[in-house]
């Protein structure tokens, strides 16, 4: 009888209130800690703010905020006044001061050690020490919050299929006004697959890329066993084969390395490289081949200079050199193109030697998610005088052999890529991948777009119209999400209004840039103990790094030294649509190469 009375009382008692931290009351990176079931406390330690919700700035913080320009103002200054920047670029001292500020201001947004992960919304030793997790910039939304975004918005998020079809799917190809080309698009995909290696068997919050940065595991393999299978063990070189007088990767049969190929791909076209998914498209295999050639070329240079070195030292030093080349190309060619700055970004690790800087990195799940730049893809790929749709291009290394690297480089440098921001520019062939990106973001319980904007010191949007810069999509988004503070991160990045004549909107840049620069400059080779000629084979190896560029990489390894850049050189191409709209390729809906990719190991 007493037990029944107890149960009755329990059923009549009011339920516990929602977790008080669900409303994200603590501002300016203050840490919310619940007290009991209905109260909270904000820890404002070292935020520069105080008060119940860490919303009142200290004196020095107030001064800094008054003097600090908005991100859009900084972007405007750096992308205009070309004559002034040409002068600045020629004054080393002044250029170094600005470059140091760019690096530190961005990198300090990502302070090590890592903080949260998909399972821990609070600091824990597991979140710090377990390298198999992606870290997180913001903790996941708590399970006991009333809505998926905390307290704002509806209790259920809209169907991801509806989001993709209404706001993301391409109606007509929109070229990137910055002139980004397919040489850039495939470089981005190839480069990032060394650290974006989601372990889908364990879930989207886990990674197989335990190096968490630029380690060139996509060239050499993630494990020592894979690396050994790819090595020649002579003069430091990697295995290769010669076809029609040119060097290409060895085959799976010759190396016994696991690669992902469908059964119909013949043995002689099953090339084996460091990253198991690079057989997906010839654009990835193009860069895999270029870096294979570069490694063996550097080995020859070091062998000539250091004849007494054995195979192991030649291999290890060459790998360090290629890591350095990669970082330099990414900063000075890749990031500079994306930024659109007239200021010349420079790779010089010594600029940070007198700064407080930690040479370590942990890849964040949000960084992985925001890098899903599928709008870059055109509806067809043009190589020389031939046009290939997705069905013809995927898992078809014969195209690489047919055209050769020279034609690939020339053609991809000429073909413009799509604009990423602005919405409605994702090709039909990868729409399922877009759904997967949204669904996995929900599985990892990302906080809202505005919470991420606040985390990276960007003013939150006040309305959907402010987000999109127009009325149609804004109205439809409001009907689905109800509140701008409930807008999801990933779809928002793709529908956000682009900056003027730019590929991205504000949020993509302000979140992505800190992750990128911290990952690049936090590499061990950039540290004072590593950054010495003696660790790279002397002055000869050091010079290879310090003179590297995308053009020199191609010239040193591709016959004829074709002109190469990350943007098309004809300005008219950035103003006109050059590729057919997706409606003419609606039959591609049934092919989904990126889902094949996801099922095995990684993301496009």
From Swiss-Prot:
Processing after translation: S-nitrosylation by NOS2 (iNOS) activates enzyme activity. S-nitrosylation may take place on different Cys residues in addition to Cys-526.
Chemical reaction(s) catalysed: (5Z,8Z,11Z,14Z)-eicosatetraenoate + AH2 + 2 O2 = prostaglandin H2 + A + H2O; (5Z,8Z,11Z,14Z)-eicosatetraenoate + 2 O2 = prostaglandin G2; prostaglandin G2 + AH2 = prostaglandin H2 + A + H2O; (5Z,8Z,11Z,14Z,17Z)-eicosapentaenoate + 2 O2 = prostaglandin G3
Subcellular location field: Microsome membrane; Endoplasmic reticulum membrane; Nucleus inner membrane; Nucleus outer membrane
Pathway recorded for this protein: Lipid metabolism; prostaglandin biosynthesis
Residues under site feature: Aspirin-acetylated serine: 516
Cellular component GO terms held in the UniProt record: endoplasmic reticulum membrane; neuron projection; nuclear inner membrane; nuclear outer membrane
Post-translational modification S-nitrosocysteine, affected residues: 526
Glycosylation-annotated residues: 53, 130, 396, 580
Gene3D superfamilies: Haem peroxidase domain superfamily, animal type, Laminin
Cofactor descriptive note: Binds 1 heme b (iron(II)-protoporphyrin IX) group per subunit.
Signal peptide region: 1-17
Binding-site positions, substrate: 106, 341
Function as written in the Swiss-Prot or TrEMBL entry: Dual cyclooxygenase and peroxidase in the biosynthesis pathway of prostanoids, a class of C20 oxylipins mainly derived from arachidonate ((5Z,8Z,11Z,14Z)-eicosatetraenoate, AA, C20:4(n-6)), with a particular role in the inflammatory response. The cyclooxygenase activity oxygenates AA to the hydroperoxy endoperoxide prostaglandin G2 (PGG2), and the peroxidase activity reduces PGG2 to the hydroxy endoperoxide prostaglandin H2 (PGH2), the precursor of all 2-series prostaglandins and thromboxanes.
Other remarks in the entry: The conversion of arachidonate to prostaglandin H2 is a 2 step reaction: a cyclooxygenase (COX) reaction which converts arachidonate to prostaglandin G2 (PGG2) and a peroxidase reaction in which PGG2 is reduced to prostaglandin H2 (PGH2). The cyclooxygenase reaction occurs in a hydrophobic channel in the core of the enzyme. The peroxidase reaction occurs at a heme-containing active site located near the protein surface. The nonsteroidal anti-inflammatory drugs (NSAIDs) binding site corresponds to the cyclooxygenase active site. Conversion of arachidonate to prostaglandin H2 is mediated by 2 different isozymes: the constitutive PTGS1 and the inducible PTGS2. PTGS1 is expressed constitutively and generally produces prostanoids acutely in response to hormonal stimuli to fine-tune physiological processes requiring instantaneous, continuous regulation (e.g. hemostasis). PTGS2 is inducible and typically produces prostanoids that mediate responses to physiological stresses such as infection and inflammation.
Similarity field: Belongs to the prostaglandin G/H synthase family.
Name under which the protein is recorded: Prostaglandin G/H synthase 2
């Amino acid at each position: 009888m007493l037990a029944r009375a107890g149960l009755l009382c329990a059923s009549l008692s009011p339920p516990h209130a929602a977790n008080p931290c669900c409303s994200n009351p603590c501002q300016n990176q203050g840490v919310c800690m619940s007290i009991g079931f209905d109260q909270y406390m904000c820890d404002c330690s070292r935020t520069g703010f105080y008060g119940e919700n860490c919303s009142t700035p200290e004196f020095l913080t107030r001064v800094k905020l008054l003097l600090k320009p908005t991100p859009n103002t900084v972007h405007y200054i750096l992308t205009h006044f070309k004559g002034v920047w040409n002068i600045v670029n020629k004054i080393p001292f002044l250029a170094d001061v600005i470059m140091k500020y760019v690096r530190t201001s961005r990198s300090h947004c990502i302070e090590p050690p890592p903080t949260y992960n998909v399972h821990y919304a609070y600091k824990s030793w597991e979140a710090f020490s377990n390298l198999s997790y992606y870290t997180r910039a913001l903790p996941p939304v708590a399970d006991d919050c009333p809505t998926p975004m905390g307290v704002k918005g509806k209790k259920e998020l809209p169907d991801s299929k509806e989001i993709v079809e209404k706001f993301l799917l391409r109606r007509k190809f929109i070229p990137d006004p910055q002139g980004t080309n397919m040489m850039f698009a495939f470089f981005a995909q190839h480069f990032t697959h060394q650290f974006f290696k989601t372990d889908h068997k364990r879930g989207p919050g886990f990674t197989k890329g335990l190096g968490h940065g630029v380690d060139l595991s996509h060239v050499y393999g993630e494990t020592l066993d894979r690396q050994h299978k790819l090595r020649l063990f002579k003069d430091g070189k990697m295995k290769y084969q010669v076809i029609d007088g040119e060097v290409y990767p060895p085959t799976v049969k010759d190396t016994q390395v696991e690669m992902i190929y469908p059964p119909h791909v013949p043995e002689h076209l099953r090339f084996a490289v460091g990253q198991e998914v690079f057989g997906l498209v010839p654009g990835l295999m193009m860069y895999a081949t270029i870096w294979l050639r570069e490694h063996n070329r550097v080995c020859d240079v070091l062998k000539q200079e250091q004849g007494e070195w054995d195979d192991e030292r030649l291999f290890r030093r060459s790998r360090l050199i290629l890591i350095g080349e990669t970082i330099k190309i990414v900063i000075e060619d890749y990031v500079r193109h994306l930024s659109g700055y007239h200021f010349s970004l420079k790779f010089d690790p010594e600029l940070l030697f007198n700064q407080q800087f930690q040479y370590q990195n942990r890849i964040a799940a949000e960084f992985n998610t925001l890098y899903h730049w599928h709008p870059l893809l055109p509806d067809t790929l043009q190589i020389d005088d031939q046009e290939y749709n997705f069905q013809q291009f995927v898992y078809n290394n014969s195209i690489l052999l047919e055209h050769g690297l020279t034609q690939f480089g020339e053609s991809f440098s000429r073909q413009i890529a799509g604009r990423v921001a602005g919405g409605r520019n994702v090709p039909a062939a990868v729409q399922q991948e877009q759904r997967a990106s949204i669904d996995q973001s929900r599985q990892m319980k990302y906080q809202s777009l505005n919470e991420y904007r606040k985390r990276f010191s960007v003013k939150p949007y006040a309305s959907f119209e402010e987000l999109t810069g127009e009325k149609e999509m804004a109205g439809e988004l409001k009907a689905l999400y109800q509140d701008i503070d409930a807008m999801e991160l990933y779809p928002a990045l793709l529908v956000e209004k682009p900056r003027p004549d730019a590929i991205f909107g504000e949020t993509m840049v302000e979140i992505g840039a800190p992750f990128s620069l911290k990952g690049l400059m936090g590499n061990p080779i950039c540290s004072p103990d590593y950054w010495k000629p003696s660790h790279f084979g002397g002055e000869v190896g050091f010079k290879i790094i310090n003179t590297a560029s995308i053009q020199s990489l191609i010239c040193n390894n591709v016959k004829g030294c074709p002109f190469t850049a990350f943007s098309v050189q004809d300005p008219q191409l950035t103003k006109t649509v050059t590729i057919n709209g997706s409606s003419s390729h609606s039959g591609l809906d049934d092919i989904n190469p990126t889902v094949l990719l996801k099922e095995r190991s990684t993301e496009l």
